Regions:
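N-terminal catalytic cores of secreted or lumenal carbohydrate-active enzymes
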Residues: 85-182, 186-189, 198-200, 227, ...
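Active-site cores of enzymes that catalyze phosphoryl transfer or operate on phosphate-rich substrates
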Residues: 122-142, 149-170, 245-297, 518-519, ...
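C-terminal (or distal) subdomains of carbohydrate-active enzymes
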Residues: 221-224, 238-240, 250-252, 268, ...
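Catalytic grooves of carbohydrate-active enzymes
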Residues: 97-108, 112-113, 260-453, 599, ...
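HTH-adjacent hinge/linker in prokaryotic transcriptional regulators
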Residues: 54-89
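Catalytic-core regions of glycoside hydrolase
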Residues: 158-171, 177-356, 647-649
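Extreme N-terminal segment that seeds HTH/winged-HTH DNA-binding domains in transcriptional regulators
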Residues: 1-47, 51-54, 78-83
């Protein structure tokens, strides 16, 4: 039975009369309809009409003059008109309206195909702007405008005219990157590039950033945008938002406070878009006519008194050519008008005092993206690492400095959200791989000349204490040990250079040893092929079966996980054996190999264990330095099949009820509680996502960059990686996602292709460090160690510390040449105020200046006293 609710007739009479008074249809002294007339008009009884009229008399809207009838009171008419005028002023405020295509640079088509799509879109917008001098449109990435100007140089003059008039609004960075999977330095550089291009080429200093469709917003985005010169943001997904501070829907703008306290003004209604597609009303009425769809959405907007900017967007389609005609027709019928306006004007006029304030991040969402096509993410990390080292070493190369701008531009394209997330076609992936190959080639380390019997090692990481350096030849005078094609030896010094003589004799080969051994820091036992590890200092933080592989059936899309059934493959379904255990003068090396045993399809009806899974084998190579406070694991996995998600599990003894799960984020770290599949007795360890719809796109994982750390009051464990961002720190376990291969269709009706399943061999590297107290600086150092190990360099550098700080809570993000000197960018890692001195050979003969993020020199600084706010990003120029 369908239930309907109607307003009682007496209330309806009151409402209608009040409305006519407020609209001015009934003026002061006017007589309202008679009781008899109203009984017919409203189809009701005399008593209902009389009660309604008496109610209006009581509220001082009407006065009764006996047999003459009821009349509008003077005070009521005046008050109603004033109130209505105030409301009319707000409600009649024009709706700012702009056309901004969301231009995917790569996704279900490749880069070249999207170039042509955008060319046609912008051509049409230029035609429409010539026909209608009001028409206003925007471009959300500088890569789009830059490419179009190359394609259509004849339009450049007119583009400039539109920009000068405010009818074409450039906004945002070079590209809209994924803000969880690329480094903070890459995000900042990408925004600086976009800002610089708009300013230098078009004379446009846009204050509006655009991150539409970004898969989550990390907590340092406000500071990054502010450092790049942006004041306002058109956001992407605002997932897991604080519902009290920012309910959905919310109007106007809100103030987003980042990790360091920097604010940015953001449009609140991320859903305020109109576009094409299939519009459904209650699942029954379907509208596929884009003209009708856009018309109806704009008409609906005219009935909404809220303060917002309306954005008409498509991805690949052309916009409706008669848009201005539709708008004019609607404006003739409605009190609230729609008016073309750019986002800057909207933001500048928006209320900014009594507005919501939101802190932190907008994560997680589309968590499958953290693992899909893992090789793209791992090679992007490698490319970021190499460009950091290449720019640093370029300071010491002879001759003309290398221009890294073309390399950075390709890296921005790789970091585009639909590229690095892996959710694209195999055809698109080919071009992404080409760009990765280009960046890796252009930043590859120069080959050192070893013929003179000497070599130089540079530890481009801030790890204090002993670490292992590698060289293609053994050093003289100190112990070394061969591992593959390299010789490993102890190196002590953070961001330090040392020179070595080449040994005349190769060291003796490592010898077979017991599977049970000790280093200065760890007790290790591989007697049955399964890792049993204990730290020797303080409470043991290692759990049993360290490095266990965990597989589960996963039938999601490339973006979203979807788990079917409870079948999980773990140790009981795994065959693993000890292959070798060796000892040399520098380290112990343990190798195990194994595979997932065949099993019946308990979940589903075909294949091995479940539909889609075929096989997985693996090899683990552990390196335990004898005198270092950490150890490493090289994991090789050979996977075949689909519909499978693979983790490696590092169990700990951390008490999940009092634990602090920390994840490195761009330019900082955040504590994030588990939120999915929480055991019923551990709900006190969890957080719950703000809205049930958040769970549709998030299934347990959180993103991290170089490291995660899991600790309680008695100690903890840091795990560093070389490009595997997807983690779960839950129930005392550190789970790292290695591979996933969902087969379901989602956005763009993309059928996941064979390439997205990543069948074949994959290599991963991890490092581990137990600790007794939570210390983010040690985690930061371990993450740097994995990604920038001490190695031989071809360049000539003075021995000693290149750059050092008096405290450990400052991390180096970049060292490169700039127009004004040497740019050094660092950030505070522990979330505390600090006064720190900076020293090292890099500063020799140079003065330190505070600088803008783009290298613009500001005031002189005292290198002996550099002040940092919590999580502050600072840029210095040395000259």
């Amino acid at each position: 039975m369908k239930l309907t609710t109607k307003m009682p007739k007496g209330e309806r009479i009151v409402s209608e009369i009040k409305k006519k008074i407020e609209e001015g249809t009934l003026q002061e002294g006017d007589r309202v309809s008679t009781v008899r007339e109203m009984t017919k008009l409203f189809d009701t009884s005399v008593s209902v009409v009389q009660n309604a009229l008496q109610s209006l008399v009581k509220d001082k809207y009407l006065e009764c003059k006996g047999k003459s009838g009821y009349y509008v009171r003077k005070q009521a008419a005046k008050k109603a008109v004033e109130t209505a005028a105030e409301e009319q002023t707000e409600q009649n405020k024009p709706i700012p309206f702009i056309v901004i295509h969301h231009n995917d640079l790569v996704w279900r088509r490749n880069f070249d195909e999207y170039d042509e799509i955008r060319r046609k879109q912008i051509k049409l917008e230029l035609e429409m702007s010539r026909k209608d001098p009001r028409f206003t449109f925007g471009i959300e990435q500088s890569a789009v405008l830059e490419r179009y100007a190359e394609q259509e140089p004849g339009d450049v003059k007119y583009l400039q005219q539109l920009i000068d008039e405010g009818r074409l609004e450039p906004s945002g960075a070079f590209s809209i990157q994924d803000l969880n999977l690329v480094s903070g330095e890459a995000i900042l550089m990408c925004h600086l590039h976009g800002k610089k291009y708009y300013k230098e080429v078009w004379g446009c200093d846009t204050p509006v950033a655009s991150l539409t469709d970004a898969f989550g917003l990390c907590s340092q985005i406000p500071q990054i945008l502010a450092l790049s010169g942006f004041q306002y943001l058109i956001p992407g997904r605002l997932n897991n938002r604080d519902q009290k501070a920012l309910p959905f829907p919310a109007d106007g703008v809100f103030r987003w406070i980042g990790l360091d306290g920097t604010p940015i003004y953001v449009t609140a209604r991320e859903g305020r878009y109109t576009g094409h597609g299939i519009g459904r009303e209650g699942g029954s009425v379907v509208n596929t006519d884009n003209v009708t769809r856009v018309t109806n959405m704009l008409a609906d907007a005219q009935n909404d008194p809220s303060d917002y900017i309306m954005i008409y967007t498509t991805e690949e389609a052309l916009i409706i050519e008669n848009l201005s005609e539709i708008m004019d027709n609607l404006n003739r019928k409605a009190a609230r008008k729609i008016a073309y306006q750019n986002a800057k004007t909207y933001f500048e006029a928006a209320e900014k005092e009594n507005i919501p304030q939101v802190y932190g991040e907008f994560n997680p969402t589309l968590t499958g993206c953290y693992t899909t096509r893992i090789s793209v993410k791992m090679d992007n990390r490698k490319a970021e690492n190499q460009i950091f080292e290449a720019e640093l070493l370029d300071l010491y190369r002879k001759g003309k400095s290398k221009d890294f701008t073309p390399v950075w531009k390709q890296l921005y394209l790789i970091g585009f959200h639909d590229a690095i997330c892996g959710c694209h076609t195999d055809h698109a992936n080919e071009q992404i791989r080409e760009k990765l190959d280009y960046v890796l080639k252009e930043t590859a380390p120069a080959k050192a000349n070893l013929k003179d019997g000497t070599f130089t090692v540079f530890a481009m990481n801030q790890k204090n204490g002993i670490q292992l350096a590698s060289a293609p030849v053994p050093p003289a005078g100190i112990p070394s040990q061969k591992d593959g094609d390299a010789y490993l030896f102890e190196f002590d010094g953070a961001f330090t250079v040392k020179k070595y003589q080449t040994a005349k004799k190769k060291p003796a080969a490592a010898k077979k040893c017991s599977a049970k051994f000790e280093t200065d820091y760890y007790k290790v036992n591989f007697s049955n092929g399964i890792a049993r590890i204990e730290n020797k200092n303080g409470k043991n933080v290692f759990g049993n079966d360290f490095g266990e592989l965990v597989l589960r059936p996963e039938y999601g899309t490339m973006w979203q996980e979807e788990y079917k059934g409870a079948k999980i493959v773990r140790r009981d379904d795994t065959e693993e054996k000890l292959v070798s255990c060796e000892e040399g003068p520098v380290f112990f090396k343990v190798v195990t190999e194994g595979f997932i045993k065949d099993g019946l399809p308990e979940i589903g009806n075909i294949d091995n264990h479940w539909p889609g899974f075929e096989s997985l084998s693996f090899r683990k190579e552990y390196i335990f330095p004898k005198h270092a406070d950490h150890f490493k694991l090289k994991l090789t996995v050979d996977f075949h099949g689909r519909n499978t998600k693979t983790y490696i599990n590092f169990p700990t003894t951390v008490d999940c009820h009092t634990a602090h799960p920390l994840y490195q984020v761009p330019f900082g770290s955040m504590e994030r509680k588990p939120y999915f599949e929480i055991p019923s007795n551990e709900t006190d360890s969890a957080q719950f996502l703000a809205h049930q719809s958040d769970y549709e796109s998030a299934k347990g994982d959180w993103p991290a960059l170089n490291w995660v750390d899991y600790s309680d009051g008695n100690g903890g464990l840091t795990v560093a990686n070389n490009g595997t961002p997807s983690h779960q720190l839950k129930s005392g376990n550190i789970m790292v996602a290695l591979l996933r291969s969902g087969t379901r269709i989602l956005d763009g009706n993309l059928m996941p292709e064979v390439g997205s399943f990543e069948n074949g061999i994959h290599e991963y590297e991890f490092a581990f460090q137990a600790h007794q107290t939570q210390d983010v600086t040690k985690a930061e150092q371990l993450g740097q160690l994995v990604n920038h190990p001490a190695r031989v360099i071809a360049e000539t550098l003075p021995e000693g510390d290149v750059l050092s700080f008096s405290q450990e809570n400052v991390a180096i993000s970049a060292i490169r040449k700039s127009e004004n000197g040497i740019l050094v960018r660092v950030y505070e890692t522990q979330g505390r105020y600090a006064s720190i001195s900076m020293s090292g050979s890099l500063l020799k003969g140079k003065t330190v200046f505070n600088a803008e993020a783009d290298g613009t020199v500001l005031e002189k600084e005292n290198a002996a006293e550099l002040n940092f706010k919590p999580f502050e990003i600072r840029t210095f120029i040395l000259k």
